[in-house]
Design a protein with these regions (language model features):
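Active-site-proximal helix/loop segments of hydrolytic enzymes
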Residues: 2, 8-206
Length: 206
């Protein structure tokens, strides 16, 4: 199954590594210029990807955190709360029997949740292995953040650290630390892709 990978946010080097490793795959950045895109525009880019039979797409948003608590620190990976209900399928999939649509949509939501959690775990493992004791893991969490709520595909939001924490801000401006963070995210996505392809894809066509 062919997989399209969409990268949004702070660390564009991740996309570069993915392009090198997967030249046959479509790697999309939600922006490749300095023009600011709203969160809605970013998820619109993701949702506009047209899938053919045996194709799938994932969305990875990379963000830098901030807090009123200047001591807050660490990195975390978010996925959409499993209890949040939304429409992820085109209603044409059940045009012959509309009563089937809620069932099919619910099944797809569950698939997306499973894949999002798995992707989050792989990425967290990658970050922990690369960053070590330079920063702390805040864990994998579920919430209804805009980017994971509005991307109709398996998706995660990665918060790489707090700019409002003086020490962490210095780390995030360090080339060596950014390289480790980039490598950790890349390793996690790559591990997910490998798992995905070995299982021949575990999401049906949108």
């Amino acid at each position: 199954m062919d997989l399209t990978i969409i990268i949004s946010g702070a660390i564009c080097l991740v996309a570069g590594l993915l392009v090198q490793t997967y030249p046959e795959k479509q790697i999309i950045m939600t922006r490749n210029t300095d023009k600011f895109l709203s969160l809605g525009e970013r998820t619109d880019v993701a949702n506009s990807v047209k899938l053919q039979k045996d194709e799938a797409v994932i969305y990875v948003s990379v963000h830098v955190n901030a807090s009123l608590d200047k001591k807050a620190s660490g990195y975390e990976v978010w996925y959409l709360s499993p209890g949040y209900r939304r429409t992820v399928l085109d209603k044409s999939v059940a045009q012959d029997d509309k009563s089937l649509f809620p069932i099919l949509n619910s099944l797809m939501e569950e698939e997306y949740t499973t894949e999002s959690i798995l992707m989050a775990k792989f990425i967290m493992d990658g970050l922990q292995a690369q960053i070590g004791n330079k920063s702390k893991s805040r864990g994998i969490k579920a919430e209804e953040w805009f980017v994971v709520r509005n991307a109709n595909m398996p998706s995660v939001l990665i918060e790489v650290g707090f700019l409002t924490n003086q020490e962490e801000a210095m780390n995030l401006n360090s080339d060596s630390y950014l390289q480790k963070t980039t490598q950790g995210i890349y390793n996690g996505i790559s591990a997910f892709v490998t798992h995905f392809e070995r299982s021949r894809g575990f999401t049906t066509k949108k």
